C-alpha cells in the first residue's frame, strides 16, 4: 500500500486530478482563450495540419481545441481512468482524436519520434522527476517538430506563494471530498475580492473574466497536488537545455508562469 501511495505521488497525484476532471468535465468556451495564453510563443492556429500528443490530457480540454484548430490527429495520454473517461466523452465526436493510459515518465517506445508536436500544459511542475519526463516527451517529437510546455513560475508568485502553499498543504492531505468542500467555500469568500481588487498581475486580472464555476475549479486544482514546482527562468533554461538538438524559446506569460517551445532541429 505504501509503495502504491509513493507511486501515485511520483506521478503527480493523478487520482486527485481525476476527481477534479470528472467533476469539472465540461469544456467551457472561455477555456480556448486560457489555452492560447498558456501556449505563449506558439499559436493555436499553428496546430493545423499537425499530429499532436498531449501529455496529461485530463478531461480532454486541450486536445479538443487542438482538433478544432485543425490538427490532423491528436493523442491524449493520462494516468487516471476517471480523467480518461471524461476525455473520451469530450472527444467522442472527433474521429481523429483518441486517448490512452500512459505515464509521462514511461511513454510507449512505439510512439517515439512520431509526433509533429508534443504538449504538456500545467503537468510537468507536478511530477517528481520532471527531467525524466521531459526526456521521454522529447523522444516522441519528430525531426522538425516541437515540444510545448506551460509551467508555474517563481517570478510573479512570490507574494501569493505562501498563501497557496498553506492551502495546498491542507488540501493535499484531506480526503478529496473535504478538499472540494473547502475549495467551494474559499471560492465563495474570494469571489467578491476577485471582482473588486485592481490586481496588477495579468493572471489575477483575467480571473474576473471567468465564470464562477471555472474559478472554483482553478482554486480546487491548486489545492490538490502533493507536488508543485515553481521554477525561475534559470530553472527553465536548465530544464530545456537538457534536450539534445533542441532550440528553446521561453516566454514569461500572464505575469506568473512560463511558456516554452523547444524545436527539434
Where are these regions (language model features)?
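Short, glycine-/aromatic-enriched active-site segment of Class I SAM-dependent methyltransferases
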Residues: 160-167, 208-228
Amino acid at each position: 500500500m505504501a509503495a502504491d501511495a509513493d507511486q501515485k505521488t511520483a506521478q503527480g497525484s493523478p487520482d486527485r486530478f481525476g476527481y477534479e476532471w470528472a467533476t469539472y468535465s465540461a469544456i467551457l468556451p472561455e477555456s480556448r482563450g486560457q489555452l492560447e495564453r498558456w501556449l505563449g510563443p506558439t499559436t493555436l492556429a499553428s496546430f493545423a495540419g499537425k499530429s499532436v500528443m498531449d501529455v496529461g490530457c485530463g478531461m480532454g480540454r486541450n486536445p479538443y481545441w487542438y482538433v478544432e484548430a485543425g490538427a490532423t490527429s491528436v493523442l491524449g495520454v493520462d494516468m487516471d481512468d476517471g480523467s480518461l473517461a471524461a476525455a473520451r466523452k469530450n472527444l467522442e465526436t472527433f474521429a481523429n482524436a483518441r486517448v490512452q493510459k500512459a505515464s509521462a515518465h514511461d511513454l510507449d517506445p512505439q510512439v517515439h519520434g512520431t509526433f509533429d508536436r508534443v504538449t504538456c500544459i500545467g503537468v510537468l511542475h507536478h511530477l517528481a522527476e520532471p527531467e525524466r519526463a521531459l526526456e521521454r516527451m522529447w523522444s516522441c517529437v519528430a525531426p522538425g517538430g516541437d515540444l510545448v510546455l506551460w509551467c508555474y513560475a517563481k517570478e510573479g508568485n512570490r507574494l501569493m506563494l505562501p498563501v497557496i502553499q498553506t492551502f495546498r498543504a491542507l488540501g493535499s492531505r484531506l480526503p478529496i471530498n473535504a478538499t472540494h468542500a473547502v475549495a467551494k467555500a474559499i471560492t465563495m469568500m474570494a469571489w467578491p475580492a476577485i471582482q473588486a481588487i485592481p490586481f496588477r498581475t495579468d493572471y489575477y486580472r483575467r480571473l474576473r473574466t471567468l465564470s464562477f464555476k471555472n474559478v472554483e475549479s482553478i482554486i480546487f486544482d491548486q489545492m490538490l497536488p502533493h507536488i508543485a514546482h515553481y521554477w525561475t527562468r534559470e530553472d527553465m533554461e536548465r530544464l530545456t537545455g537538457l534536450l539534445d538538438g533542441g532550440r528553446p524559446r521561453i516566454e514569461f506569460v500572464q505575469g506568473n508562469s512560463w511558456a516554452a517551445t523547444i524545436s527539434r532541429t
